[in-house]
């Protein structure tokens, strides 16, 4: 960790160790960080304390260590679209009721690419068949899978458009119950999903593989992977085999293949917080009365992940508005200070006995944010994190 980042961590240490994990980098901290980086002397905690601080931050994100993804790590467009949809960004994809249902029961979405070295299966007449194995060992044991889908890309074929025709294929997805053996070159399989598709458009096809993934993760069954079978219903084999992209073309570069290669997506819940939801801009509940400048209220605070050197593994957002609470809780407590009965009594006692502390200005309402990041295994994860944004402050 570079010296500048350690200076920043030292400035942020009190906020996290004292439980104020809603924000990381206040404007004051930015100025101090700039000064510390330019050589101004400042007291710094020990390396052990800084390491403990970073571990606490990572623990808050459910990580055991800081991810260090390679430059070749790929973020599937599907996951980026999913993030935009659930973060409510302008220009996000149109609503997808199937995805909304899946996300309504999950707070974590994970994506997996298959291991290409295990693709080949014997060809059969009129069919293209591949075995796909996805390593799901990075899914935490406490995460319950609520649904899973296999994404397969199909390309629009110019022959179909030029002839105003529609060549059809049937895509069958099987779970491998028992792998092929020396005595049997074909594995024992169970049909999971099937669909009839044509060549008139380029799009992703989604197949429900929830039963298989739940057996592997929740019931302890062995994961032998899937068989994807494309049945060519027309005779033009040379064209149709290139239509459904279940394997990489001979001269296709790594980047273009990474954008359309098959993808397994799991939706799960770790029992913490609420499911993913589309974040909408909140409206003010009521007009705020004129307050004293020093009274308890919400203040701006922007968290920039690049300031702590985490922008290499956090894909989106680059930062977020966390806000923080600060200000006086004077006697008598006004209605707009959103106080509890206990805070009112405590403030009353403080007015006659200074040994009793005043009520504190703290967050009274918090909301979640969605984060898209690369985990320790370079798997792309979309997760909902609770209590990250201060929505309201009060005296408590």
Swiss-Prot record:
Location of this chain's protein in the cell: Secreted
Organism (species): Homo sapiens
GO CC annotations, alphabetized: BMP receptor complex; cell surface; cilium; enzyme activator complex; extracellular region; extracellular space; intracellular membrane-bounded organelle; plasma membrane
GO biological process assignments: ameloblast differentiation; animal organ morphogenesis; aortic valve development; astrocyte differentiation; atrioventricular canal morphogenesis; atrioventricular valve morphogenesis; BMP signaling pathway; bone development
PANTHER family: BONE MORPHOGENETIC PROTEIN 2, TGF-BETA FAMILY
Protein known as: Bone morphogenetic protein 2
First and last residue of the signal peptide: 1-23
Principal location: secreted
Propeptide residue interval(s): 24-282
Subunit details: Homodimer; disulfide-linked. Interacts with SOSTDC1. Interacts with GREM2, RGMA, RGMB and RGMC. Interacts with ASPN. Interacts with MAFP5. Interacts with FBN1 (via N-terminal domain) and FBN2. Interacts with type I receptor BMPR1A. Interacts with type II receptor BMPR2. Interacts with SCUBE3. Interacts with TNFAIP6 (primarily via Link domain); this interaction is inhibited by hyaluronan. Interacts with ERFE. Interacts with BMPR1A/ALK3; the interaction may induce HAMP expression.
CDD domains in the record: TGF_beta_BMP2 (cd19390)
Gene that this sequence comes from: BMP2
Pfam family, one: TGFb_propeptide
Function statement: Growth factor of the TGF-beta superfamily that plays essential roles in many developmental processes, including cardiogenesis, neurogenesis, and osteogenesis. Induces cartilage and bone formation. Initiates the canonical BMP signaling cascade by associating with type I receptor BMPR1A and type II receptor BMPR2. Once all three components are bound together in a complex at the cell surface, BMPR2 phosphorylates and activates BMPR1A. In turn, BMPR1A propagates signal by phosphorylating SMAD1/5/8 that travel to the nucleus and act as activators and repressors of transcription of target genes.
Disulfide bonds: 296-361, 325-393, 329-395
């Amino acid at each position: 960790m570079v010296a500048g980042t350690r200076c920043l961590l030292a400035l942020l240490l009190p906020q996290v160790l004292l439980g104020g994990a809603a924000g990381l980098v206040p404007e004051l901290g930015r100025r101090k960080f700039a000064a510390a980086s330019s050589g101004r002397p400042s007291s710094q905690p020990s390396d052990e304390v800084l390491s403990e601080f970073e571990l606490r931050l990572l623990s808050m994100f459910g990580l055991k260590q800081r991810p260090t993804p390679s430059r070749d790590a790929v973020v599937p467009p599907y996951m980026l679209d999913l993030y935009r949809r659930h973060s409510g960004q302008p220009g996000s994809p149109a609503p997808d009721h199937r995805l909304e249902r899946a996300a309504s029961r999950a707070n974590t979405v994970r994506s997996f690419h298959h291991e290409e070295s295990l693709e080949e299966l014997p060809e059969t007449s009129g069919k293209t068949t591949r075995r796909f194995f996805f390593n799901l060992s990075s899914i935490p044991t406490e995460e319950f899978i609520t649904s899973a889908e296999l994404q397969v890309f199909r390309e629009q074929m110019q022959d179909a458009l030029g002839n105003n025709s529609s060549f059809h294929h049937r895509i069958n997805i099987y779970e491998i119950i028992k792998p092929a053996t020396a005595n049997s070159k074909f594995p024992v399989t169970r049909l999971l999903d099937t669909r009839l598709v044509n060549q008139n458009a380029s799009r992703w096809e989604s197949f429900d593989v929830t039963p298989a993934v739940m057996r592997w993760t929740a019931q302890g069954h062995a994961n032998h992977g899937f068989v994807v079978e494309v049945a060519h219903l027309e005779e033009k084999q040379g064209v149709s085999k290139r239509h459904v992209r279940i394997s990489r073309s001979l001269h296709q570069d790594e980047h273009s293949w990474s954008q359309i290669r098959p993808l397994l997506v799991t939706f799960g819940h770790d029992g913490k917080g609420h499911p993913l939801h589309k974040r909408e801009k909140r409206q003010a509940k009521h007009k705020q009365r004129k307050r004293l400048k020093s009274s308890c209220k919400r203040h701006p605070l922007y968290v920039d992940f690049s300031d702590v050197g985490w922008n290499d593994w956090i894909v989106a957002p680059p930062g977020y508005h966390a806000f923080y609470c600060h200000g006086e809780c004077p006697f008598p407590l006004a209605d707009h200070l959103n106080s509890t009965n206990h805070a009112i009594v405590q403030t009353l006692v403080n007015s006659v006995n200074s040994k009793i502390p005043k009520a504190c200005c703290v967050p009274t309402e918090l909301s979640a944010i969605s984060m898209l990041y690369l985990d320790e295994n370079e798997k792309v994860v979309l997760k909902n994190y609770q209590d990250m944004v201060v929505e309201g402050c009060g005296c408590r």
